Amino acid sequence: MRYPVTLTPAPEGGYMVSFVDIPEALTQGETVAEAMEAAKDALLTAFDFYFEDNELIPLPSPLNSHDHFIEVPLSVASKVLLLNAFLQSEITQQELARRIGKPKQEITRLFNLHHATKIDAVQLAAKALGKELSLVMV
């Protein structure tokens, strides 16, 4: 999951960073490297707000070959996809817990970006939502 980044030279120096798909994620840096590091932090922070507010997270636009991008860690990408599938299903966390035979507390952890969730747990929840989580190496 790669989100395209727009780097714009700032009038005072350095670079301003924005995301077409996640407009809340704005930051800046003195160098391109600093701006890109700050962009990753801003993107993950924006994701936290989507999770807290139970809102669908926009998926990334297609990349052009010259685009700068932030690659989302797989642990986060899987939870983003799971959150979107869960919200589209319109069921409760309690119902998801019932479907996979786990306590609701474990479901709450699935939707916490700061909890190190086993990928098998995300896969099980996705399956309970009628989705398939797959991993591809290219």
From Swiss-Prot:
InterPro entries: Cro/C1-type_HTH, HicB-like, Lambda_DNA-bd_dom_sf, TA_system_antitoxin, TTHA1013/TTHA0281-like
Annotated SMART domains: HTH_XRE
Gene: hicB
PTM note: May be degraded by Lon protease.
Keyword list, A-Z: DNA-binding, Repressor, Stress response, Toxin-antitoxin system, Transcription, Transcription regulation
Subunit details: Probably forms a complex with the mRNA interferase HicA; when the 2 dissociate the mRNA interferase becomes active.
GO CC terms in record: toxin-antitoxin complex
Name under which the protein is recorded: Antitoxin HicB
Organism per entry: Escherichia coli (strain K12)
Keyword Disulfide bond in annotation: no
Deleted gene: phenotype: Disruption suppresses an rpoE disruption; in a wild-type background disruption down-regulates extracytoplasmic stress responses and outer membrane vesicle production.
